[in-house]
């Protein structure tokens, strides 16, 4: 299917549903890039399998993988997880996959954004991203949905929506000169409103400290439900994350969402800080743009979790804050099963569980009134 549409979601009455709305499936991609995943990806692959297995308790999972690694992925993954052959340059499905929109008549369509590996020639993380840029349309073809081609360089991890007209993002990412330098903030807001059918955009200044995506919002905060957000907090005034988190809290505490609500802010602890060890910097192909260094600060965050039907899948790091984060998430989602998955090796690649997943909503999404 995957026929191109020349209108827009707003014009056609489609909106991006929130992550807490019903999902048909979750898509992931197999990690094999040897300049990003040490020892040919074997450590990360084990954690991707664990994440997928956790998700599969409540939601169907589809993996994409190139032809060379198809058998490897198929053998490693449980039988109930679908594996299909679609190549990509790396495995960040949140950023390269389709962003789906739905209407109240049970129809679904897909947005394909432009992708430039988090910065293109200015500060992108790799030199060739043509395969990544083709994933969204191929994904929509498999799910059987028409496609809007949005004229905006945008990664899925740079936005969160509440499903009721509010979008959250960061100035650090969306206004970065490596994304859409020809567009003003107002231009970008207009395009987000047209292609996601949102009414109000709440801008945080920065994302998590040392986040190589230029500060994706999904690594510092998450939408729990309309009017309620979770945010990574920092209590160490000597940590560079401290000022970032306090500034974000100030913005969110003063914000009014699209429905006129003030926001409840649930604070998540910050793990660590965590750093790349000597062993973790070894056994990587050399790369100018993704040169992992011993002692490099890792952008670890419990906010980088996935809501999927009746489960919450969140990253753990072997830190004392893991259990505290689980308790906070369980209180925030009392009717969900909260599943922690050890994800340090995913973190070493530059993201975490939310970054490596992309949900496909049910066609019969909840009607917003």
Curated annotation (Swiss-Prot):
Reaction catalysis annotation: agmatine + H2O = N-carbamoylputrescine + NH4(+)
NCBIfam families with a match to the protein in the record: agmatine_aguA, PRK13551.1
HAMAP family: Agmatine_deimin (MF_01841)
A Pfam family it matches: PAD_porph
Protein name, UniProt field: Putative agmatine deiminase
TM region positions: none
Matches recorded under InterPro entries: Agmatine_deiminase (IPR017754), Peptidyl-Arg-deiminase_porph (IPR007466)
Keywords: Hydrolase
Family designation: Belongs to the agmatine deiminase family.
Gene3D superfamilies attached to this UniProt entry: L-arginine/glycine Amidinotransferase, Chain A (3.75.10.10)
Disulphide connectivity of cysteines: none
Positions annotated as active site in the UniProt record: 355 (amidino-cysteine intermediate)
């Amino acid at each position: 299917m995957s026929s191109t549409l020349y209108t827009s979601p707003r014009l056609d009455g489609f909106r991006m549903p929130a992550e807490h709305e019903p999902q048909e499936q979750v898509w992931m991609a197999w990690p094999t890039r040897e300049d990003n995943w040490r020892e040919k990806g074997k450590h990360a692959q084990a954690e991707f399998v664990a994440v997928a297995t956790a998700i599969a308790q409540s939601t169907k999972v589809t993996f994409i993988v190139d032809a060379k690694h198809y058998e490897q992925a198929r053998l490693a993954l449980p039988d109930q997880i679908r594996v299909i052959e679609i190549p990509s340059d790396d495995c960040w499905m949140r950023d390269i996959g389709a962003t789906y929109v739905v209407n109240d008549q049970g129809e679904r369509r897909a947005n394909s954004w432009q992708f430039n590996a988090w910065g293109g020639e200015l500060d992108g993380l790799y030199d060739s991203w043509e395969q990544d840029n083709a994933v969204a349309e191929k994904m929509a073809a498999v799910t059987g949905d028409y496609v809007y081609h949005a004229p905006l360089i945008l990664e899925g991890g740079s936005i969160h929506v509440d499903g009721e007209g509010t979008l959250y993002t960061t100035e650090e990412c969306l206004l970065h000169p490596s994304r859409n330098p020809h567009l003003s903030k107002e231009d970008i807001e207009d395009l987000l409103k047209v292609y996601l059918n949102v009414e109000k955009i709440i801008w945080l200044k920065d994302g998590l400290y040392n986040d190589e995506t230029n500060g994706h919002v999904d690594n510092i905060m998450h939408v729990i439900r309309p009017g309620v957000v979770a945010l990574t907090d920092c209590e160490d005034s000597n940590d560079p994350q401290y000022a970032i988190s306090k500034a974000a809290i100030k913005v969110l505490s003063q914000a009014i969402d699209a429905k006129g609500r003030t926001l409840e802010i649930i604070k998540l602890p910050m793990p660590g800080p965590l750093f790349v060890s000597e062993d973790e910097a070894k056994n990587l192909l050399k790369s100018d743009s993704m040169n992992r260094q011993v002692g490099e600060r890792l952008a670890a965050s419990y906010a980088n979790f996935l809501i999927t039907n009746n489960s919450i899948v969140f990253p753990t790091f072997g830190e004392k804050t893991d259990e505290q984060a689980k308790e906070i998430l369980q209180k925030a989602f009392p009717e969900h099963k909260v599943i922690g998955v050890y994800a340090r090796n995913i973190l070493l690649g530059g993201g975490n569980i939310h970054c490596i997943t992309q949900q496909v909503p049910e066609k019969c999404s909840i009607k917003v009134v």
